[in-house]
Amino acid sequence: MESNQYGHVTVLLAEAVEALGVKADGLYIDGTFGRGGHSAEILKALGPQGRLLGIDKDPRARRTAMERFSGDDRFLFRQGSFADMASFVSELQWPGVDGVLLDLGVSSPQLDEAERGFSFMQDGPLDMRMDPDSGLSASEWVNTAKEEEISKVLWDLGEERFARRMAKAIVAARQTQPITRTLQLAEIVAAANPRWEKGKNPATRAFQAIRIFINRELDDLAQGLEQAFGVLKPGGRLTVISFHSLEDRMVKQYMRDIVRGPKTPKWLPVVDDAPPKAKLVGKKIRAGETEVVANVRARSAVMRVLEKC
């Protein structure tokens, strides 16, 4: 775990970089640059010929990248989604990469900066966009979406059992006045939640669901996993840290499917002797007790590693 002056506490820092098996002259991608915690550690292990590409949607991440690593010729940055990493690799004319790291979800600064609109703990404009210059804000969506759509998003992406009640409450509230503030939305969904989970804010699942929807996080993840595996060289590793069950299930299933290969119908007379495309590296890793005590956000972190054959 690393805490730096850029306001972000990096989860599973040593474990993630160790899992990549960084080679001094290797080519690597930090697909979720954030505030550069993982990138800084990867650069420590790279030699003069090694290269690291940082990717992030957030324009503030770009500014941080320039501040931290502008004098390091081994580091490059592209603002965008890791779902487009193959195009960045092609643009750089890299033959492939030796490792890709994805640290999913929202970063500490994004949560802690009220004006970004991610947090239900402090008041701010209801935005939630990783890239504030792209797409609908959360406020625009909750004020225009149909009740059925809101309910579906809360259920599918937040696994919120009171999704229908919350959607109904949101639609009723916006008829009185537009929903434009984070605490305004938090109060609406909390009031529609009759059974608060112990130790969890009643708005947690709703905010998670809306954030995932606004930023197309699961769509990006599905595409990003495919692209990451596609750009890996043989022997290259994909390391993914997820923070909620929806992400982790997708990562687990994708890695399992790659390792097992395509299913062949039992009735086909085919000898299944094709070499595997990939192998799992170890078991899933969780943050240790010491890290969780120091950073409660590490509690839900799960890391999985895949190596291309």
From Swiss-Prot:
Known function: Specifically methylates the N4 position of cytidine in position 1402 (C1402) of 16S rRNA.
Gene3D superfamilies tied to this protein: Putative methyltransferase TM0872, insert domain (1.10.150.170), Vaccinia Virus protein VP39 (3.40.50.150)
Pfam families: Methyltransf_5 (PF01795)
Enzyme class: transferase
Family to which the UniProt record says this protein belongs: Belongs to the methyltransferase superfamily. RsmH family.
EC number: 2.1.1.199
Localization (cell): Cytoplasm
Catalytic activity: cytidine(1402) in 16S rRNA + S-adenosyl-L-methionine = N(4)-methylcytidine(1402) in 16S rRNA + S-adenosyl-L-homocysteine + H(+)
SUPFAM superfamilies per record: Putative methyltransferase TM0872, insert domain, S-adenosyl-L-methionine-dependent methyltransferases
Taxonomic source organism: Hahella chejuensis (strain KCTC 2396)
GO cellular component: cytoplasm
GO molecular function: rRNA (cytosine-N4-)-methyltransferase activity
Annotated protein name in UniProt: Ribosomal RNA small subunit methyltransferase H
Gene Ontology biological process terms in this record: rRNA base methylation
Residues the record lists as binding S-adenosyl-L-methionine: G36, G37, H38, D56, F82, D103, Q110
NCBIfam families xrefs: 16S rRNA (cytosine(1402)-N(4))-methyltransferase RsmH
InterPro entries: RsmH, SAM-dep_MeTrfase_MraW_recog, SAM-dependent_MTases_sf
Keywords: Cytoplasm, Methyltransferase, rRNA processing, S-adenosyl-L-methionine, Transferase
Main localization, broad class: cytoplasm
